UniProtKB/Swiss-Prot annotation:
InterPro entries: Dihydro-acid_dehy_C, DihydroxyA_deHydtase, DiOHA_6PGluconate_deHydtase_CS, ILV_EDD_C, ILV_EDD_N, IlvD/EDD_N. The lineage of its organism: Bacteria, Pseudomonadati, Pseudomonadota, Gammaproteobacteria, Enterobacterales. Pathway: Amino-acid biosynthesis; L-isoleucine biosynthesis; L-isoleucine from 2-oxobutanoate: step 3/4; Amino-acid biosynthesis; L-valine biosynthesis; L-valine from pyruvate: step 3/4. The modification N6-carboxylysine is found at residue 124. One of its GO terms (biological process) is L-valine biosynthetic process. Belongs to the IlvD/Edd family. The gene is ilvD. Mg(2+) binds at residues 81, 123-124, 492. The active site is at residue 518. Functions in the biosynthesis of branched-chain amino acids. Catalyzes the dehydration of (2R,3R)-2,3-dihydroxy-3-methylpentanoate (2,3-dihydroxy-3-methylvalerate) into 2-oxo-3-methylpentanoate (2-oxo-3-methylvalerate) and of (2R)-2,3-dihydroxy-3-methylbutanoate (2,3-dihydroxyisovalerate) into 2-oxo-3-methylbutanoate (2-oxoisovalerate), the penultimate precursor to L-isoleucine and L-valine, respectively. Homodimer. Binds 1 [2Fe-2S] cluster per subunit. This cluster acts as a Lewis acid cofactor. This is Dihydroxy-acid dehydratase. Its EC number is 4.2.1.9. Its cofactor is [2Fe-2S] cluster; Mg(2+).
């Protein structure tokens, strides 16, 4: 039977000093012997998805203490990708995932903590906390801050929903007046919470539901709604129960590595493909597999992407549906129910509620349930008032969206496509794979695209070219040396794709990169090209006006040049000596911390994790 980890710091005469310090934090005589549970918060005033989390940590802590534990809260960092985007700040976003995981490990191990509740929300924070949970393998519960309400503006006497991407797009549109832009800017992000579409943050929070590490509704219930409070209260209760079961009853079935198996990672990517989630989720699931030592690779994702139907389109893939609409349609378990009907899921896996996925689907499927509490829960909707406060409104829809023909969630028979919203492309340009969010392609004829390359060695140069009309219809923009190692940091390319959209070129051009894309990206945008340019990938040898062939139907990405020409270009590149496979004209200041990240970073097909085998101990 495992011993409480915290006993290391509280038992025995020689731990008098440690106990004295625990007492100084408020621990009483009667508390010693209770499990010490960390509340890992990510409150910050920099990020709307985290602005409201300050009090929520205390909410969870009080519930832990009521339930028989000692709660101790600490914070991680949290970067807002939207604010960091379009300048050198984005270099720090992906590396922050590792920094978050490491900082949690340091705090948990240094203080011999028994378990943790992770309060996350936005893009790299949820993945960083997931990596930490798998690394530490102690009882863990996830509860996120929840999605933002969609923005609303009045256009021709009709309410139109908008989000952050609309503000970016109109910011680049020369035809948008300053008055109209200001109205959009003030309306796009009306409340606290993670941005209102199926971008990276909400995609990852939805995946924690199917992974079994959070409660139903965690990914879809609005940050502002009163019902969300119960998720935090429940987290405090459940973590104490699960912690005692592990340490006192030797029950390891609900540890992160027991829950997150290869079959469960498959469930997660199946959900992601069917709901057209962010392509960044692929990166994070691969990193989780690495952390848990699970043999889950791009080939597994490729095989699943060919047979999972696309059942849901939410902004940025749709201008009609947002996270508030997704929740009304049953959220994650609404989609899982449809996927289970066609036998795509492994439903025997347990979750933190100690329920199998099968039982959880049956209980929370809005098409089946007669439970008034569950019906009321999924009726939660937007308050449509600007606020930075959680639990500040209690609006409920009079009717749920149970339409599986043309509603927010569809059945297989009425799917948007037979194969899902994400696809893996391979070929000589992406030997180890690349990712495209097919859910974001509205023009089906764009699934086969061929054109001349326009090559740029930084996102900044590509943006300049787009905004100054150097890009023409039919071009394929190549942005290289923006991978995990080459960037370093694998920047998101939301600005280039948004600017293409603002200039009416999003359906007439393609963009390929060894960098990555925001969950808000649309159009023919292929990222995660592996190996990246800095790891001697063929993308480093593409020249202007080379013809590139993209075939999403056949899952291929090819540079149309001969093997002899490739050999000559390799020789020429390698003759650059120590400067081989580095950008030729880029002016970019790289900090020491980013240089360290670059030294160990792997390409996207490995989840952009650090290759620790480069370190000899």
């Amino acid at each position: 039977m495992p011993k409480y980890r915290s006993f290391t710091t509280i038992n025995g005469k020689n731990m008098a000093g440690a106990r004295a310090l625990w007492r100084a934090t408020g621990v009483k005589d009667a508390d010693f012997g209770k499990p010490i549970i960390a509340v890992v918060n990510s409150f910050t005033e920099f990020v709307p998805g985290h602005i409201h989390l300050r009090e929520l940590g205390q909410l969870v802590s009080k519930e832990i203490e009521k339930s028989g534990g000692i709660a101790k809260e600490f914070n991680t960092i949290a970067i807002d990708d939207g604010i960091a985007m379009g300048h050198s700040g984005m270099l720090y976003s992906l590396p922050s995932r590792e920094l978050i995981a490491d900082s949690i490990e340091y705090m948990i191990q240094a203080h011999c903590v028994d378990a943790m509740v992770c309060i996350s929300n936005c893009d790299k924070i949820t993945p960083g906390m997931l990596l930490a949970a798998l690394r530490l393998n102690i009882p863990s519960v996830f509860v996120s801050g929840g999605p933002m309400e969609s923005g609303k503006i009045l256009v021709n006497e009709k309410i139109i929903k908008i989000d952050l991407v609309d503000a970016m797009m109109h910011g680049a549109n020369k035809n948008t007046s300053n008055k109209k832009l200001l109205n959009i800017e003030k309306s796009a992000c009306p409340t606290c919470g993670s941005c209102s579409g199926m971008f990276t943050a909400n995609s990852m929070n939805c995946l924690t539901e199917v992974l079994g590490l959070s409660f139903p509704g965690n990914g879809s219930l609005l940050a502002t709604h009163i019902d969300r409070k119960n998720l935090f209260l429940k987290a405090g209760k459940i973590i104490v129960r699960n912690t005692k079961n592990y340490y006192e009853n030797n029950d390891s079935s609900l540890l992160p590595r027991s829950i997150v198996t290869k079959e469960n990672l498959k469930n997660a990517i199946i959900l992601d493909i069917s709901m057209g989630g962010s392509s960044n989720t692929v990166l994070h699931l691969l990193a989780m597999a690495y952390e848990a030592n699970i043999n889950f690779k791009m080939i597994d994702i490729d095989l699943l992407s060919r047979k999972v139907p696309h059942l849901c389109k939410i902004s940025p893939s749709s201008s009609k549906y947002y996270m508030e609409d997704f929740h009304r349609a049953g959220g994650v378990f609404g989609i899982l129910s449809e996927l289970n009907k066609i036998n795509l899921l492994n439903t025997s896996i347990l979750n933190i509620l100690r329920m199998s996925l099968e039982k959880t689907i049956n209980k929370f499927d809005i098409l089946k349930t007669k439970d008034k509490k569950i019906i009321s829960f999924y009726s939660s909707g937007p308050g449509n008032k600007k606020t930075i406060y959680p639990f500040s409104q209690s609006f409920r829809w009079k009717k749920l969206d149970k339409d599986r023909i043309s509603g927010c969630i569809r059945s297989k028979k009425y799917a948007y496509s037979k194969d899902g919203g994400l696809a893996v492309l391979t070929g000589n340009l992406a030997k180890n794979g690349s990712i495209i969010k097919t859910a974001a392609i509205t023009n089906q004829s764009s699934k086969i695209f061929s054109g001349p390359a326009k090559v740029y060695e930084s996102q900044e140069d590509a943006v300049y070219a787009i905004l100054n009309n150097y890009i023409k219809s039919g071009d394929i923009i190549v942005i290289r040396y923006e991978g995990p190692k080459g960037g370093p940091g694998m920047q998101e390319m939301l600005y280039p794709t948004t600017y293409l959209k603002s200039m009416g070129l999003d359906k007439k051009c393609a963009l390929i990169t060894d960098g990555r894309f925001s969950g808000g990206t649309s159009g023919i945008s292929i990222g995660h090209i592996s190996p990246e340019a800095a790891n001697k990938g063929l993308i480093a040898l593409v020249y202007d006006n080379d013809i590139i062939n993209i075939n999403i139907i056949d899952r291929s990405l090819k540079l149309k040049i001969s093997s002899d020409e490739i050999r000559k270009r390799k020789e020429k590149e390698e003759n650059r000596g120590i400067f081989a496979y580095t950008p030729k004209k880029r002016l970019r200041k790289i900090s020491d911390s980013l240089k360290i990240y670059s030294m160990f970073a792997t390409s996207a097909d490995k989840g952009a994790v650090r290759n620790i085998h480069k370190i000899n101990f």
